[in-house]
């Protein structure tokens, strides 16, 4: 959605502060104020320092060019200058500029501390600016603004290379707030530079010639400083400037600014992409035929009558991979695999999915083939993965990856180890290559899920964002922003592709989806110490806290509450130890530079997935970060419910495969709580005390009073009748009873999370157990399919549903 919107001039006058407490023991504070507006990139101002004062008076004025359609939150930080150690930050204030009415001077007093003793007085004025409006593209949560491109050409005509000692001179250009920020080049090499920056950016290009020697930089020998205001380049004018140099005054720069294309390379929208919608139409033809045969229907189903069935597989390392193979094999034997439209998973379940989709016809072939491949590599010793030859191969591949521009981390090494362990070699298959498996609707659409978290400041419970991967696109559910998988990992700015990198082989994505090495100490503490009830209470409180700021934003009360008084350096260091992730994934952020819409927090599409306090502070959200930090989605809830409940998919039946060894209903009930708290329709899950002690093989959950809620079939990992039956209805002979003894005891099982090597016998037992449990529930599955058929019927759907 495109729109035109004018820019405004924000003037901020920092007046004075009152009753500032001392930070140093021997003297009063030496305060100064730093002002920053993230939506005006590159603009950062600082007042003068007032020495030894608890009542500093600054009376200084600063100016920002702002766009009224985005969320402009000014950050004012009060610092205490220290000549010996790092300056201490005393207070930080976040102020929503939308409270300032255009043309009316507003004086604001900020109460800084929790007791409100310290105060800061500031004046604000917003005025209209001349000039054409800015063209914006928005989905009402994110906003892409106009970009300009600055080309700089170094002209050395008339200069004498020998006389200027060219080998020791470098040209450094700095454009704060641009994608490139700083570029440096020796005068004897490249002579062209390019910067991408906000068209409505009120900043300057800074440059200098400086001397570079083999021993390092010599800042004292810097020469040729110059500044070019970007406004002087408006209208596509070409400007030539002379750059004074130490020995050669003849160096000139030719500068020209042009508009960047308005089209985006990031898709902004919450609807399903057109490729997925086309797939659904193709897949419904396959599903309709399979349902007609399975349910013995006497007529063909029309497209709008075909129910949408999805599989939701829990994580659990090799246990999840093996178990999912057993479940899919059983569905194939029952002739029900073609009834499934979506196949979603996290963590270890994605290993099975990624392997299967390497064959475009996998669900139309006997699954015993790919399962035998997995069995072979699961049973082999993994010591070869650590042989000198293998390690040398990993090193070569990581070097190649780095040379392509990808940042390499320990997660990439995990990817290579994982691929070698599971398949004996590193294949070149990609996520986008899985489209071949969807072109005729011959397989379900795979949905892979991950979490984006903070790298070193917050634990997973207090900041997490769902990131979905499909063969068609990768994106954030909360922001409604997606890119094709070919471009995931490439560098973006303001929705435009800046630098394209080769698509990563899927093993590197598998390592992200199952990245169990990014737990910080706080995550570990919550996992060990929190009970289920404490987790539920936290979810309710955290989500409730995201609902409060929207009301508060309409008044000045929110601004007074949005102060931050950071702790001491020791406290910050201790927090860093607790929340740091030493082995996390680093990747380019395709949301980088995009800004939040003025009314983003009130949008239903955003609030559906908003579940942490940071959601009310734009500068804390992902568009402001240069990199992503993706981890295993099982860190929060061990299932892929966000993919199943994404608006637009409207599932009628979910087959939920649980792979936990002990807490069989925990992730299921966590998903129910989360969905209900977020306003998503989830069938009511009620588990009796008897079932908690001795779970059954299959549960059916439905809510007839809520037509929006899908029917849900839950299959926990249990060994009930399989102990006595080789196949449904066939009792084991005394000689066969050993084959039904599958050890699922948490303390003695061979299927513990970190075990990557199963004996062939253990692999077969786990595979056959899941195969049997699902086949033994055939009648319940058929009942659920009939309910789904009824659920999809036009008279059963709420108005407006599809």
Residue ranges and their predicted role:
Residues 19-28, 52-53, 57, 69-143, ...:
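C2-type phospholipid-binding modules
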